[in-house]
């Protein structure tokens, strides 16, 4: 049944499009579907473009969501991180922020780096790609991963492409736009249904209010280097979680 889903993507032309988001330097060999244009940190195929942020969180962050705007997407990237586990040094369950997975590699102040992204959005205007965040690592009460992951991540990437084409609606939440469970193809998945999917798409405002408090502490490290736009986004998140 897994092959059936892959065949569906292939026949619809979406499998090649999805490969675009993970094929790196091999994109020209893998994608004989037209010219590929590289612009900054993202690639476009035809009229489609998307940026994908990644989180590794056992709860709070949904399986996938779309940012509310370019600035909101930069904000999402600035607060990404993972929770410490028993295998990691330090306290368990503490969120370690790694903005845009660049903290160990950025050779200058992260505040300036974020400002660069914000300026890039201004230059791109309505040509800016849509920004998404994925979190494959939601767990149940026993610590088991809920989403099957691996090749089934294509199902989520297909939804992202559909959003880029305005083919599906989404549910507005305090953090952005999440899928309707029926809009993610679950064909062939065993022991996984729309109820499980709904559980990892849920946005808990109380947890996000706590998250916002943690971001507030994190942002203090950057002092006057923190762009005002990100401060505004944090304030907006705090207000929306109270609604």
Question: What is the role of each PLM region?
Answer:
Residues 1-243:
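Conserved NTP phosphate-binding and transfer environment spanning the P-loop NTPase/kinase superfamily
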